């Protein structure tokens, strides 16, 4: 019995001893792993550099090894093979210890107290040294260029230099959103960033995760404490551009992608690049940039009144990357990047869309079949573009939503109007759309209208059968039997009295249908109309009848173009030949006027003039087309001749006789001017003296620009000025001017202001002066014998003026009516 107990105790002691050894080995392994961690190894490397201690493996190249080490036999092939075998042996020992630790992990609580760190250091000092050598050799061999590492080892960094000197070489740090900026900013070129990427390869973070971390902030802090700028990746810009193209700028998916970009520390230049690449048109980018600058200006004014001194330095140039901040945008405070992203996204949401009524919230109305939630979304989106994401505008938006909603939604909201917008959405979620009473009623009425339209089928007026109209009927025509080719146009199978063609098969213009035709539709002819100029009461073209050659009761005669003519704006006024009218006697007077339809509707301008029928010749009419090209065909009726009929029944004027230019009498005062000299006249206009030449051919007076005071206002006239030259838009006085002659005569006129060498006084001044032209007292005897004979028949008496009773009247001369149609007129 005693032997059995002794055996059990001995077995238990052996078991405890074995567990003790296993636990001891496990704790030693933990200490080794802790000492070989990245941070501890960096601290030891920094300590060695601080005290000038150099690693014995400074490089494998011959140029970096001292000659003394080569003479002592270090780093020879035998030494390298020995150390390599030692490293493999150490790996096997660590693997065996790890296997034993996994077997006894459940008995961790049965072990003795852990060994002190000093004992562990003494026991594994040699192993630790070998591990450091192995790690340094591993880093130097595969993850860092030899030249860069040699420079770093030859120039150790002083202790405490830089804010991040205690961190291991190559570690990438992400700055907090509102942390203080490092003292220095380093913009690394591409080659240095590749070197930094190699130095970060000894991190425990996988390379894919490191790439995602780099995307988080295009501006990030490097390993040496400086900031590095990395551009936004191509895939992110591509996804944003595709989202804008497929869904639009304000789609939810597009805005979510912008919110993801807002979490990054994007510089102003980055935002401009991203927006320019994402928006489809350059005009949209310019609109966004203008809105962004406006919002940045408002944000800069708010920053100037901030409490913190850092935020007061965030000016407009800083937020937009202009001025002194155009070259270096990575040294901003971390909070400034958040403001830049906020202003950029806010202005993105404010971009206008084609066809929308932006800025008019009262026009956002809920449709009859639109759900209440969609209507609220449209109203909220339109309000955000005007007010931004402001809570102060929430009451106004709610009031507009209530007023612009449908009648059913307002009835549901009214009992709980003070509950808020979220409660309105819950109550009205089933209202709106085609399933409401109003929607069902509209659908029922629409279906009834469709059924009624199906039953109300019209029948053919030719055959009387339903299903088609007369124009599509294939049955023979009841009125005329079998149809033949039209004798009028020659282009279709229909009767001539039903022809609606404007031109025949040869291109000639057809006359309008006769109003006395046997077949006239009930609603009038609905076919095409004549393409020529319209005539008020008469057709423009058509067969000329003999009755049109004679004066009608209205005393108007239509004149036809004698040939084809083309008028253009740059041609100014051109004479257009017209056909003479042989039925009018010679000496007939008339006034040429344009037709209303031709002048007003078609753009042709016929300039009025007095026309006297002389000997048979080729007559012409002055026409122009200032608004476009106008084509005149031969035979078109363009001008009208308004005949001036004789007036033999005119009574004598009972009032005082008014003598004006053109009248003469015994008591008339004459101004005799010799034609050897230029007839000059000096006038005082608005207190200033002007000297000019009398021009009987000018309707309006003209003042030279050399005489015109600069203080007097002028404007451009809408009428053209035609004389020896042509002026399309002449300058004219803006106000009426008062003139006064040396004899006290006064009047008002509105002169033209043109660059002429002299001033010209026209008939607007000479009429008020009472000037006349006369050759009665000419040295050659005055009028010719033929003229005196004609004047004698009209009642002229030499030396007593022109007129029957020497009355000097101003009305037109009334010739004696002759039955043989001779003289100036006829009764």
UniProtKB/Swiss-Prot annotation:
* Mapped zinc finger ranges (CCHC-type): 458-475, 484-501
The UniProt record lists the G-patch domain at: 783-827
Highest rank taxon of the organism = Viruses
- Name the Gene Ontology molecular function terms of this record: aspartic-type endopeptidase activity; nucleic acid binding; zinc ion binding
Q: Look up keyword Zinc and say if it applies.
A: yes
Ranges annotated as biased composition (Basic and acidic residues) = 800-809
The record's section on SUPFAM superfamilies has:
Acid proteases, dUTPase-like, Retrovirus capsid dimerization domain-like, Retrovirus capsid protein, N-terminal core domain, Retrovirus zinc finger-like domains
In the UniProt record, the signal sequence range is 1-25
Annotated ranges, domain Peptidase A2: 690-765
Record EC number: 3.4.23.-
Residues at the active site: 695
Q: Which UniProt keywords apply?
A: Aspartyl protease, Hydrolase, Metal-binding, Protease, Repeat, Signal, Transposable element, Zinc, Zinc-finger
Q: Which Pfam families match?
A: dUTPase, G-patch, Gag_p24, Gag_p24_C, RVP, zf-CCHC, zf-CCHC_5
Under the heading Gene3D superfamilies, the entry gives: 1.10.1200.30, 2.70.40.10, Acid Proteases, Human Immunodeficiency Virus Type 1 Capsid Protein, Zinc finger, CCHC-type
Which segments show compositional bias classed as Polar residues?
515-529
An example GO biological process term is: proteolysis
Q: Which intervals of the chain are annotated as region Disordered?
A: 108-143, 504-556, 800-827
Comp. bias intervals (Acidic residues):
119-133
Show which residues form the site (Cleavage). 22-23, 217-218, 261-262, 441-442
Q: What is this protein called?
A: Intracisternal A-particle Gag-related polyprotein
Which source organism does the UniProt entry give? Mouse intracisternal a-particle MIA14 (IAP-MIA14)
């Amino acid at each position: 019995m005693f032997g059995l107990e002794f055996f059990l105790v001995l077995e238990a002691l052996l078991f405890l001893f074995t567990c003790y050894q296993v636990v001891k080995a496990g704790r030693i392994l933990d200490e080794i792993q802790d000492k070989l961690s990245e941070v501890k190894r960096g601290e030891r490397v920094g300590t060695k550099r601080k005290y000038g201690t150099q690693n014995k493996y400074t490089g494998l190249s011959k140029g970096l090894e001292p000659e003394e080490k080569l003479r002592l036999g270090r780093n020879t092939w035998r030494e390298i093979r020995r150390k390599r075998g030692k490293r493999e042996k150490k790996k096997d020992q660590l693997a065996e210890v790890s296997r034993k630790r996994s077997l006894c992990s459940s008995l961790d609580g049965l072990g003795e107290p852990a060994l002190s760190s000093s004992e562990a250091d003494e026991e594994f000092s040699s192993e630790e040294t070998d591990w450091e050598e192995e790690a340094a050799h591993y880093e130097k061999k595969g993850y860092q260029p030899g030249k860069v590492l040699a420079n770093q080892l030859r120039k150790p960094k002083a202790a405490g230099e830089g804010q991040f000197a205690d961190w291991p070489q190559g570690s990438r740090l992400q700055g907090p959103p509102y942390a203080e900026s490092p003292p220095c900013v380093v913009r690394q070129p591409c080659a240095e960033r590749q070197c930094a990427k190699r130095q970060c390869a000894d991190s425990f973070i996988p390379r894919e995760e490191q790439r995602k971390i780099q995307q988080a902030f295009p501006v990030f802090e490097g390993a040496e404490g400086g900031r590095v700028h990395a551009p936004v990746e191509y895939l992110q810009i591509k996804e944003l551009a595709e989202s804008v193209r497929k869904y639009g700028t304000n789609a939810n998916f597009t805005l979510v992608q912008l919110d993801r970009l807002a979490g990054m520390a994007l510089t102003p230049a980055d935002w401009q690049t991203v927006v320019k690449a994402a928006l489809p048109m350059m005009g949209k980018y310019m609109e966004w940039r203008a809105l962004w600058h406006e919002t940045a200006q408002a944000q800069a004014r708010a920053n100037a009144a901030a409490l913190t001194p850092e935020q007061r330095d965030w000016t407009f140039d800083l937020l937009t990357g202009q001025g002194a901040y155009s070259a270096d945008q990575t040294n901003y405070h971390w909070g400034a990047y958040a403001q830049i992203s906020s202003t950029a996204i806010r202005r993105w949401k404010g971009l206008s869309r084609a066809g929308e009524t932006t800025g008019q919230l009262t026009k956002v109305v809920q449709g009859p079949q639109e759900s209440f939630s969609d209507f609220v979304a449209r109203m909220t989106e339109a309000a955000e573009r005007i007010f931004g994401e402001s809570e102060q505008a929430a009451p106004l938006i709610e009031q507009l939503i209530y007023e612009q909603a449908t009648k059913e939604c307002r009835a549901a909201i009214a009992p709980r109007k003070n509950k808020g917008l979220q409660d309105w959405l819950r109550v009205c979620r089933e209202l709106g759309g085609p399933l409401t009473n109003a929607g069902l009623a509209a659908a029922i009425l629409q279906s009834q209208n469709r059924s009624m339209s199906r039953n109300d089928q019209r029948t053919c007026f030719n055959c009387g059968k339903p299903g088609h109209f007369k124009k599509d009927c294939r049955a023979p025509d009841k009125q005329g039997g079998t149809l033949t080719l039209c004798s009028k146009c020659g282009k279709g199978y229909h009767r001539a009295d039903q022809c609606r063609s404007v031109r025949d098969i040869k291109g000639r213009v057809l006359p309008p249908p006769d109003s006395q035709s046997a077949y006239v539709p009930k609603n009038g002819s609905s076919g095409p109309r004549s393409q020529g100029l319209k005539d008020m009461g008469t057709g423009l073209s058509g067969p000329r009848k003999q009755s049109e050659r004679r004066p009608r009761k209205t005393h108007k005669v239509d004149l036809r173009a004698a040939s084809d003519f083309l008028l253009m704006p740059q041609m100014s006024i051109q004479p257009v030949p017209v056909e003479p009218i042989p039925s009018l006697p010679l000496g007939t007077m008339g006034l040429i006027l344009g037709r209303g339809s031709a002048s007003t509707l078609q753009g042709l301008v016929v300039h009025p003039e007095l026309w006297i029928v002389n000997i048979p010749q080729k007559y012409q009419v002055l026409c122009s087309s200032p608004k476009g090209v106008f084509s005149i065909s031969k035979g078109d009726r363009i001008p009208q001749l308004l005949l001036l009929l004789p007036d033999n029944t005119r009574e004598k004027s009972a009032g005082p006789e008014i003598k004006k230019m053109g009248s003469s009498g015994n008591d008339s005062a004459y101004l005799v001017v010799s034609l050897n000299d230029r007839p000059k006249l000096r006038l005082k206009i608005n207190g200033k003296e002007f000297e000019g030449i009398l021009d009987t051919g000018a309707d309006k007076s003209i003042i030279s620009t050399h005489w015109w005071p600069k203080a007097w206002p002028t404007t451009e006239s809408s009428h053209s000025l035609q004389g020896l030259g042509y002026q399309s838009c002449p300058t004219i006085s803006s106000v009426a001017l008062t003139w006064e002659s040396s004899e006290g005569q006064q009047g008002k006129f509105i002169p033209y202001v043109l660059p002429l060498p002299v001033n010209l006084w026209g008939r607007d001044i000479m009429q008020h002066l009472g000037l006349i032209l006369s050759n009665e007292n000419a040295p050659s005897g005055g009028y010719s014998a033929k003229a005196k004979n004609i004047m004698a028949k009209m009642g002229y008496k030499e030396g007593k003026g022109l007129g029957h009773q020497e009355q000097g009247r101003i009305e037109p001369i009334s010739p004696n009516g002759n039955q043989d149609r001779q003289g100036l007129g006829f009764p």
